[in-house]
């Protein structure tokens, strides 16, 4: 994809912590002009991140989404045109939305643009149905999410999460980790205030394995991915354990240096209560890129991939599975297993996913010509 003007509408603002929409924006900016729209706020400005990538801050009046559909579209059309005029934004060729709460009809920016709705999370709102109806194509990282839109005529495709190319870079700078270097090292990447954290199970695992070093990489307070911390007391509780090390948020480009130090990875969300929400976490590929074993709650998209991850159906069984794996970590990290995990991650880079998306877009556009 080259020479295009692309708007990306994100529910998470630009910041240190990257998820799919940030990675896509960064990659697309290498050969296109990308405008990354932060979620609405009281800020109104546009600024450069790097060549080809600008961040757009804007405000929207409250209550628009409670209006009747026809009135909402009229008002959003006026607001979109005003926003483009005030920021001197060029007409987009592609409008790619990850956010169902703003501009459900993307044609308000340009009726001739290709309109993409990309659902990477479960959104509890009927507004998402309008996004699907008005899009030219819908993508999602999980089949379970797409199942929610069954029967709707818009073309839909499951596209796995992507892996940034720097996770495959063999030239990794050395980093020093706190704690006894002889201990098994287990990593976790993500927001410790994520709404679906299973702290009861996590704390049990941490307490039962005091000779293992647990490294938590990611924000443990407010961040660009979550502005209202929920589990501050739980974070403080695990922080007091001698075998727990909170390393804080790290830029995506620095993560490989830390991940490649680990012997295993742990994921511990309340997945059985939120199967669709947990259907395909993006961090899985980052873990698999190291080749090391991943012990996790239930992940529907990987339910048939026991060759890649060690997974439980219920978190009741997670502590015992974790104990089994770390007691025999060398068995779970044989050369053949490591190679298989790495190959899977390499097949799912953002570059490869973007190629799949571009092929789909060409097919859809040719059918509408």
Located regions from the model:
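Conserved donor-binding/catalytic core segment of Leloir-type glycosyltransferases
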Residues: 178-197, 202-206, 214-217
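N-terminal subdomain of nucleotide-sugar transferases
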Residues: 1-45, 207-209, 213, 369
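Carbohydrate-associated surface elements
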Residues: 144, 162
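Nucleotide-sugar-dependent
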Residues: 15-19, 194, 253-258, 265-286, ...
